[in-house]
Amino acid sequence: MNTRNTRSKQRAPFGVSSSVKPRLDLIEQAPNPAYDRHPACITLPERTCRHPLTDLEANEQLGRCEDSVKNRFDRVIPFLQVVAGIPLGLDYVTRVQELAQSSLGHTLPEELLKDNWISGHNLKGIFGYATAKALTAATEQFSRKIMSEKDDSASAIGFFLDCGFHAVDISPCADGRLKGLLPYILRLPLTAFTYRKAYAGSMFDIEDDLAQWEKNELRRYREGVPNTADQPTRYLKIAVYHFSTSDPTHSGCAAHGSNDRAALEAALTQLMKFREAVENAHCCGASIDILLIGVDTDTDAIRVHIPDSKGFLNPYRYVDNTVTYAQTLHLAPDEARVIIHEAILNANRSDGWAKGNGVASEGMRRFIGQLLINNLSQIDYVVNRHGGRYPPNDIGHAERYISVGDGFDEVQIRNLAYYAHLDTVEENAIDVDVGIKIFTKLNLSRGLPIPIAIHYRYDPNVPGSRERTVVKARRIYNAIKERFSSLDEQNLLQFRLSVQAQDIGSPIEEVASA
């Protein structure tokens, strides 16, 4: 799909250096064993794969964080396996509680255990509760981390403004492999002006985003935050699609049938529609900047589609960070930075299918350059922990729970949760359906229930906001139970309902389902 015009007789460059049109519409094929090693390092077998721009300290901290969070979830099933072998009867509750405290770090509600002598093991209920407790602990851990990184957030806001953006609104696919997009893949801290909402297939809600844009612009006008409305900065909307280089027709985007071309074009079309909506709904030159990013979920390397001088994007005009990684691996840090920024300019100068109208603005090029540099650390993160490519059990789906609603912005780790953003089940049924489909294979096939965390945020400054948010969470809870009644009747859906004030890091407040 070319958003500018059709050049049916011209060939498109592959990446930024080849004149061969990339195969976006892939045919059925088996996993490619040639990708067992990271493609950026495959030509350098004699060298340790460590890029000169990699932030080793950050990688170590992120690794410890990922291990500690996932370990809480991964302890649940081994705990249940031991519980299943404990004889039912008088000592059952005491033995299970002692085991829970030593294995999970907490005890269990008495009602999950007290009727064991007549009803047997309540393994499904215990699984749901233990998973919810692991999520609570993860949220608290990330909240502490966010509070300790306030200086990084302030620096990020300053960087956005220097690049000409007063807000950055990111809509990745809801796939759990993109759950760590901000802190890991892009290395961007959460700020009050960084918005992230995930949707199946990156198909974000244009009306919701238009309302977010209006709210942001009104705040600039009324409060001068983060800058005043007369400053020549823009609202940046980013859509993020994903693909798999090792198994493109099976491990790509589930919402688009693992069709890379469909995933890319759908995200690009949504971006164009959103920009048109802003321009049509508001006068006086109102508009936004848009950016499209692809993520290889095998390696976490990004592909950034470069806008031209008019802000138009093109499926074939991009910088592949796997290529820039290999090109700059042996250089000094300053030399590597120069090559990366030259790659952006070279993409803008592409001919054929990738040809655009001039180069992107200086601020946009600077922003893209920093994303590419940040992502080099993530490429090395995967190299150091997994040999350059995630193992087979993590290349596909390996989520621990379904997150429904506004999501837990604090908790962002790969393959931790499948995210379904919705206000009503009817409006976003596909998001929930895709999640249930994924967990049918992950959990139901093993006899495990599906943990569903329904979570919404409220504005504490608005009277009655919390009460209405609780009602909303309960309405969604009942709607999901009704939509998947056969699973619910078998106790195969384990719910946790909670609400939270809008401020990042605010306490999680669990609420009853009725």
Curated annotation (Swiss-Prot):
Keywords: Bacterial microcompartment, Carbon dioxide fixation, Carboxysome, Lyase, Metal-binding, Zinc. Carbonic anhydrase activity is inhibited by ethoxyzolamide, dithiothreitol, cyanide, and divalent metal chelators dipicolinic acid and nitrilotriacetic acid. Zn(2+) binds at residues 173, 242, 253. This is Carboxysome shell carbonic anhydrase. It catalyses: hydrogencarbonate + H(+) = CO2 + H2O. It is an enzyme of class 4 (lyase). GO terms for cellular component: carboxysome. Its cofactor is Zn(2+). Disruption phenotype: Cells do not grow in normal air but do grow on 5% CO(2), called a high-CO(2) requiring phenotype, hcr. Loss of CA activity, requires 3.5 X more inorganic carbon for half-maximal CO(2) fixation. Carboxysomes are approximately normal except that ratio of CsoS2A:CsoS2B shifts from 1:1 to 2:1. Required for growth in ambient air. Its EC number is 4.2.1.1. Optimum pH is 8.0-8.5 for CO(2) hydration, and pH 6.0 for hydrogencarbonate dehydration. The keyword Mitochondrion does not apply. Residues 398-514 are annotated as: C-terminal domain. The gene is csoS3.
